[in-house]
C-alpha cells in the first residue's frame, strides 16, 4: 500500500479547533515537521480538513 509524506507548511495561529486537532492527530506540531502515514480514507479525511496548512507527497513503500 502507498504511503503519504505530510509536511506542515503553515502555522495553526488563527486556525479553527478542528484543524488544530486534525494536525495533532496526524502527528504534526511544528512548521516544516514531516510524518509518513499510510494512505487510507482516515488519513485522506484529516488531510482534507487541513489541506491549506500542509503539503502532501506520495512515497513509494
From Swiss-Prot:
NCBIfam families: rpmD_bact. It comes from Mycolicibacterium gilvum (strain PYR-GCK). GO terms for cellular component: cytosolic large ribosomal subunit. Belongs to the universal ribosomal protein uL30 family. It comes from the Bacteria. GO terms for molecular function: structural constituent of ribosome. This is Large ribosomal subunit protein uL30. InterPro entries: Ribo_uL30_ferredoxin-like_sf, Ribosomal_uL30_bac-type, Ribosomal_uL30_CS, Ribosomal_uL30_ferredoxin-like. Part of the 50S ribosomal subunit. Keywords: Ribonucleoprotein, Ribosomal protein. GO terms for biological process: translation. Pfam families: Ribosomal_L30.
